[in-house]
């Protein structure tokens, strides 16, 4: 435990504010695979928004209700999900409907209500606003066609996080193999919290061969991990000198 270690656990106070924070993390994508580098340096974190889409229709019998008589919110949601995917692909952003709740959620019932949550991540806040606007407009157009109703609620929006540019440039340049690439991340990290607190912060990413994250397939090769650890140790040694 911490009590048995040389470090005594105690509250972190403003008097103990760190001068710099550097985080080492596996890349949660495949940019480093594409550029053939074992390590990359984070430039910042994309803006991130979560939005609730409520689609209201009319519950009815799945067998006796003719297709043309239905007001099916599941159909409106399905078209909205496809629209979100298409718009994100066209603009190089991220849009995911990863959670859906259906009422009454019966095999033999046309739903009366569908709630779906959109996770959207974009390079800038303006791009995030634009992506949401396009998806919402297309969803509304489909709702009018389906005889359903749409309500969109913003649940949370996180602005961009910029890591210390001077520190990132120094970490990227000062190593034996040349310059590590600077890459943005679309995921939240501890480093982002500390950067927003005004602490000079940097991130090092280790190549992920699969590019997969939040899955058992996420991993990094031991050789790349060693390169990442060496880069972190070298960075900390230079910062402490």
Mark where each language-model region is.
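A short beta-alpha structural unit
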Residues: 96-106, 117-124, 149-168, 190-192
